[in-house]
């Protein structure tokens, strides 16, 4: 795997039996003890992920809030200090450049967390729209490591090695300068699994020590390292979208059912606003739906969705769900076929298998919302 980047945790994967793959140009573990075991560990106990491949950027300055609002579809004005917001960044046509988290530290200080596969593109896009805004934009990706600790026991375990009461960090809130095993970190109650949990940002040189400290703290409870395989099945069951599967620059947030994060009534303009207003007024022509495969098989990304011999869309993500123990998926289909209960076929290896549209909220989240 020459020419691939590594995270500050690259040296620990093999200690835990990690199987390494190329993901977004990084050497990362796809699994440790097996993705099914890891999936259930996060659903029932707690699991630790290396997500240091994610990108981070700081935006500061007098116009930081205005600038971020210009880039994002969600309402940045509602964000208070030490809060986190999920949002989309769109192009002029309303297509998704990326989905990301915006952290507001204090005043005019914002921290953006962006997808690894879009890191360079996003930073270039953000810097390219600076214009006359009085802001400073700094790509801080290489100076930050990120761990995600997720699962129903995550708080109980992490509490053993931190100097704050984690119950004070509510869902989509953050706290800076938290001492985790004596190391200064940013901790937020956020995640990508559908479970309660935390994302921990630290200095790269502290990452290995924190990795071992967290797993040691959770040894009795059964905490385990988790690879990319389970990360994807976990987010999929919770109907959390993946850039490149459910979204790209030709797909809008409205088409994938994420209109809640597109605030068309905000006073300020944002990139793609006019196109999204027009699309909402005219009505979407395609829609993201959940489906269950009724025949035996497993749906995969890119498989055709067929109705009465006509291709009406494609599968964006599909798995045999480890939690629900059935073959389910997400598909982007023509709007008239998106109603729950609609039957259609999925073309799996030259065979058309029966499927039915279902609610795409496959798994109810257990995050602490209050």
Swiss-Prot record:
A GO BP entry is: glycine decarboxylation via glycine cleavage system
Give the catalysed reaction(s), semicolon-separated: N(6)-[(R)-S(8)-aminomethyldihydrolipoyl]-L-lysyl-[protein] + (6S)-5,6,7,8-tetrahydrofolate = N(6)-[(R)-dihydrolipoyl]-L-lysyl-[protein] + (6R)-5,10-methylene-5,6,7,8-tetrahydrofolate + NH4(+)
Listed GO MF terms: aminomethyltransferase activity; transaminase activity
Instruction: Extract one GO cellular component term from the record.
Output: cytosol
Keyword Protease part of the UniProt annotation: no
Record EC number: 2.1.2.10
Q: Which UniProt keywords apply?
A: Aminotransferase, Transferase
Q: Which InterPro entries match?
A: GCS_T (IPR006223), GCS_T_bac (IPR022903), GCST_C (IPR013977), GCV_T_N (IPR006222), GcvT/YgfZ/DmdA (IPR028896), GcvT/YgfZ_C (IPR029043), TrmE/GcvT_dom1 (IPR027266)
Q: Which Pfam families match?
A: GCV_T, GCV_T_C
SUPFAM superfamilies linked: Aminomethyltransferase beta-barrel domain, Folate-binding domain
Query: Could you say which enzyme class this protein belongs to?
Result: transferase
What is the role of the protein in this entry? Answer: The glycine cleavage system catalyzes the degradation of glycine.
Family listed: Belongs to the GcvT family.
- What's the protein called, per UniProt? Aminomethyltransferase
Gene label: gcvT
């Amino acid at each position: 795997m020459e020419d691939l980047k590594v995270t500050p945790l690259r040296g620990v994967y093999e200690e835990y039996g990690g199987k390494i793959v190329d993901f977004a140009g990084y050497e990362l573990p796809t699994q440790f003890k097996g993705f099914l075991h890891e999936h259930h560990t996060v659903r029932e106990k707690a699991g630790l992920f290396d997500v240091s491949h994610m990108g981070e950027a700081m935006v500061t300055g007098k116009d930081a809030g205005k600038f971020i609002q210009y880039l994002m579809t969600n309402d940045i004005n509602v964000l208070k200090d030490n809060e986190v917001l999920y949002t989309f960044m769109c192009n002029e046509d309303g297509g998704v450049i990326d989905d990301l988290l915006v952290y507001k530290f204090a005043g005019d200080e914002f921290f953006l967390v962006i997808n690894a596969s879009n890191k360079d593109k996003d930073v270039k896009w953000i810097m390219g729209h600076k214009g006359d805004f009085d802001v400073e934009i700094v790509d801080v990706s290489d100076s930050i490591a990120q761990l995600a600790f997720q699962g129903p026991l995550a708080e109980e375990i992490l509490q053993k090695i931190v100097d704050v009461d984690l119950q004070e960090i509510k869902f989509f809130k953050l706290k800076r300068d938290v001492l985790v095993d004596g190391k200064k970190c940013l901790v937020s109650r956020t995640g990508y699994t559908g479970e309660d949990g935390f994302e921990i940002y630290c200095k790269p040189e502290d990452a290995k020590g924190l990795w071992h400290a967290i797993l040691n703290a959770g040894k009795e409870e059964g905490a385990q390292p988790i690879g990319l395989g389970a990360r994807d099945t976990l987010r999929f069951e919770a109907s959390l979208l993946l850039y490149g599967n459910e979204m790209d620059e030709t797909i809008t947030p409205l088409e994938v059912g994420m209109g809640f994060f597109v605030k068309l009534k905000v006073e300020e303009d944002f990139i793609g606003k006019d196109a999204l207003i027009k699309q909402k007024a005219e009505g979407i022509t395609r829609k993201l739906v959940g489906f269950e495969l009724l025949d035996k098989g497993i749906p995969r990304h890119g498989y055709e969705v067929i109705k009465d011999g006509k291709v009406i869309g494609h599968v964006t993500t599909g798995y045999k769900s480890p939690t629900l123990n059935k073959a389910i998926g997400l598909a982007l289909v023509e709007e008239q076929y998106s109603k729950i209960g609609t039957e259609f076929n999925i073309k799996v290896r030259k065979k058309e298998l029966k499927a039915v549209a279902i609610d795409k909220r496959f798994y109810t989240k257990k995050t602490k919302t209050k």
